[in-house]
Amino acid sequence: MALRCPIVSVLGHVDHGKTSLLDKIRRTRVTQREAGGITQHIGASEIPINTIKKVSKDLLGLFKADLSIPGILVIDTPGHEAFTSLRKRGGALADIAILVVDINEGFKPQTIEAINILKQCKTPFVVAANKVDRIPGWNSSEGPFILNFNEKNQHPNAMTEFEIRLYENVIKHLNELGFDADLFSRVKDTTKTINVVPVSAMTGEGVPDLLVIISGLAQRFLEQKLALNVEGYAKGTVLELKEEKGLGKTIDAIIYDGIAKTGDFLVVGNPDGVLVSKIKALLKPKELDEMRDPKDKFKPSKQISAATGVKISAPDLDSVIAGSPLRIVPKNQVEAAKEEVLEEVEEFTILTDDEGIIIKADTMGSLEALANELRKVNAKIKKAEVGDISKKDVIEASSYASTNPLNGLIISFNTKVLADAKAEIEKSDVKLLEGKIIYKLVEEHEEWTKEMEELMKSDEINRLTKPAMIKILPNCIFRQKEPAVCGVEVLYGTLKIGSPIMSEDGKKLGYVKEMRDNQQENIKEAKVGMQVPVSIDGNIVLGRNAKENDILYVEVPEPEARKLHHEFKDELRGDEKEALSRYMELKQKIENNIFWGM
């Protein structure tokens, strides 16, 4: 049975050494040509089996490994967002993953998110415990870790420190996340225990061990998955759309099954459904050369077979988006391929709600991953699209916010904000959350939602009529009417400007027009215990329908009293609760209705 290369994805926290480790394997130096030493784009590299056997020759006999796969195809990802982007029907594009962890720093938030994604996609993985060369006293050298891990080559103190860091920074965290894990040479059952392979991207130590473990695991446990369909048409996923000099727009893609030929037709998903275009050229990088930064030009291929990274030149590719499914077929199979791609695109369709927020992402897979994580925290999504944030998105979000402020949010994963959209955001009430880490965006969404809910609750409470009981102070009637002016003491609750006032027998007396403090400054409210002069405009005539020592109440409309009693009671001070309780008892008596306000 012919086997294809297993597709390997590399995940891990920023600066834990993903690209440097791959560079060591490929003997190229991509990282040094990139800004900040951090992977900026997605790429793919083929590592032929002969290369693996060459660098691992000392280990093949030790592990009794008989490798028959043609090699491995490594997707070099910027963190793990690309892993979620690269999907095929049934889950992740990658057959197996390498999770890179700095053995000295241990697990970081992105490490945990990467593991959660791997669990969700049911993708087997190996842990590369990188930067073993930085363990104090460790004598790191190029070659197999297993041959260097002994007291002949290492000081006992360095061996002890290695064991401590291996357990404390790697194995313990894996255990806490529900995985059995151990140093790869101690693993007895690879179906139940995660292999941890110590490596150094600087010296090359452990790279042979890692290649043997990855190749052996893939061949042993994924044989059925790696069976090559030697007669079927090519199936793949778009990595990214690129402008190439002399070729125009091209697609970088991973082919995971079947065979493709020059002159075949490309059938690929796009926002409108399916695009069909005749292939002009299938271009491949040379072996051990990284797809996004080759030192030599691509070479044209008449035929390619899975698994491989390929650059596709064809007309009219502008609307293609990363993460889209693709097929490469002869003319007589175009219609069947269109149906297949359409079905796969529809699987990516995200169910939306009648109301909610807007989410945008750079690829179909990452949009799906973002939506899934937001659903876990009960977020409602009105619109989910691939692409940059436009002015139209902002206007739509603003209209959603007009009915519910919680809907005035756009979450952008790894996309640009167009200039006119930025200008629109500045003059609108729309909130924009941007980022390249899904879990952080979800956390920020939860924090923003909580803040907004508290603000909305506070606004609503402030709009409600606050309960209060006041007493007209003796010898403090300054004007009888139009408006009446007198001194009052707030017995319970909060007296505010505009509060409607009633007597103990339920008669409407007017509303609070003005209040002053001891310095004769106008104030907007008076709280329990305060004695203040007030003016009351309305039917009140002091000395006639309201007298010294009379108790007056703020008249709270029944719907507002009910809201305060049921929804906002915990937000009221103790004296405000007492004012509300006494007022409701009084109204129940006056209205002869024990359910008033309940």
Swiss-Prot record:
GO CC field: cytoplasm
Pfam families registered for this protein in UniProt: GTP_EFTU (PF00009), GTP_EFTU_D4 (PF14578), IF-2 (PF11987)
Stretches for region G5: 200-202
Region (G4): 130-133
Domain tr-type G as annotated: residue spans: 3-225
Location of region: G3: 76-79
Region of interest: G2: 37-41
Alphabetically ordered keywords of this record: GTP-binding, Initiation factor, Nucleotide-binding, Protein biosynthesis
Binding site residues for GTP: 12-19, 76-80, 130-133
SUPFAM superfamilies linked: Initiation factor IF2/eIF5b, domain 3 (SSF52156), P-loop containing nucleoside triphosphate hydrolases (SSF52540), Translation proteins (SSF50447)
InterPro entries the record matches: EFTU-type, P-loop_NTPase, Small_GTP-bd, T_Tr_GTP-bd_dom, TF_aIF-2_arc, TIF_IF2, TIF_IF2_dom3, TIF_IF2_dom3_sf
CDD domains linked: aeIF5B_II, IF2_aeIF5B_IV, IF2_eIF5B
MF term (GO), any: GTPase activity
Domain of life assignment: Archaea
Region (G1): 12-19
Family label: Belongs to the TRAFAC class translation factor GTPase superfamily. Classic translation factor GTPase family. IF-2 subfamily.
HAMAP family assigned: IF_2_A
Summary of the function given for this chain in its UniProt record: Function in general translation initiation by promoting the binding of the formylmethionine-tRNA to ribosomes. Seems to function along with eIF-2.
Protein name: Probable translation initiation factor IF-2
Gene: infB
